[in-house]
């Protein structure tokens, strides 16, 4: 079993760190809100530290799941950052969805200290984290990925290396581009069914077994029909991710017209007060249009 640290105990990180402990790994956690870290320790076998650097001391693997590019830099760099506490040969695995640019920046900074760096954003949402069945798309040196794989398997069902540093983040963008179009299509379909006087749940039971079936349909259609959105992946975070997709698309010359449109639709949802609603709340925008 490995000596590990986990930085960031949000809705994803909290259960992910718990799976590490349940698998028998030694876990030290760090969270900006100390009470959250203490609560985690009260539930799981582990310790908590007051800085990322202290959490990382002696760890073979340091995992993070924080908010954005700046948050990731803050837990990695500087005298209190994880890199300052890590020993040469240790490996940092980042599960945050961030830009591929900051990933490559931190990969280089880690390499200069003799530290491995793997970008491993996740998909599967809060339920996937709680059940330990996340999909993890990774980028980085093959040797570092191979070393970290058994640890990531504590909370990941599908874990794959897609290429060098940044490849994991680019793959996560592909994932979010797919989801944006799927959720908008599902929203339009369910709204259409309602306007046509059909039983939406009965309709989905029929079509979900055919070509229209998807994870979004299977896991979100009932709550969408019932107007329940206090769960899942928040619109605010989806807009952050789509912003990364759109800026990267501009950089590499990839047109994303539907993604750009759906991003604006999510902006409309935010204006309705839905920043913390699940991404499936796109249907509320259609209902608001009448």
Residue spans for each PLM region:
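NAD(P)+-binding Rossmann beta1-loop-alpha1 motif at the extreme N-terminus of oxidoreductases
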Residues: 1-64, 90, 95-96
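Rossmann-fold dinucleotide-binding core
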Residues: 4, 66, 98-177
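Methionine-biased hydrophobic packing positions in alpha-helices, especially
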Residues: 12, 16, 65, 86, ...
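Hydrophobic beta-strand scaffold residues
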Residues: 27, 48, 116-118, 159, ...
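Rossmann-fold NAD(P) dinucleotide-binding segment
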Residues: 52-115
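Helical "substrate-binding/catalytic lid" subdomain
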Residues: 147, 166-289
């Amino acid at each position: 079993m490995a000596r590990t640290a986990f930085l960031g105990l949000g809705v994803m990180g909290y259960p992910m760190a718990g799976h590490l402990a349940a698998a028998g790994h030694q876990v030290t956690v760090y969270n900006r809100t100390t009470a959250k870290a203490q609560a985690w320790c009260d539930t799981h076998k582990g310790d908590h530290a007051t800085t990322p650097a202290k959490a990382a001391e002696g760890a073979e693997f340091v995992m993070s799941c924080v908010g954005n590019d700046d948050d990731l830099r803050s837990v990695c760099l500087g005298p209190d950052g994880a890199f300052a506490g890590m020993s040469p040969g240790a490996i940092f695995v980042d599960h945050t969805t961030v830009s591929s640019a900051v990933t490559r920046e931190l990969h280089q900074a880690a390499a200069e200290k003799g530290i491995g760096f793997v970008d491993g954003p996740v998909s599967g949402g809060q339920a996937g984290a709680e059940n330990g069945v996340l999909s993890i798309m990774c980028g980085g040196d093959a040797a570092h990925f191979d070393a970290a794989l058994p640890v990531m398997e504590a909370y990941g069902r599908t874990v794959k290396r897609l290429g060098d540093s940044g490849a994991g983040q680019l793959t996560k963008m592909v994932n979010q581009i797919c989801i944006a179009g799927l959720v908008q299509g599902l929203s339009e379909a369910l709204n259409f069914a309602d306007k046509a006087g059909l039983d939406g749940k009965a309709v989905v039971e029929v079509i979900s077994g055919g070509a229209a079936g998807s994870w979004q349909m299977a896991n979100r259609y009932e709550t969408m029909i019932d107007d329940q959105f206090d769960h899942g992946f928040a619109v605010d975070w989806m807009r952050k991710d789509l912003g990364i997709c759109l800026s990267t698309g501009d950089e590499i010359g990839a047109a994303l017209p539907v993604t750009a449109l759906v991003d604006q639709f999510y902006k409309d949802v935010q204006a309705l007060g839905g920043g913390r609603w699940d991404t499936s709340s796109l249907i509320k925008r259609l209902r608001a249009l009448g």
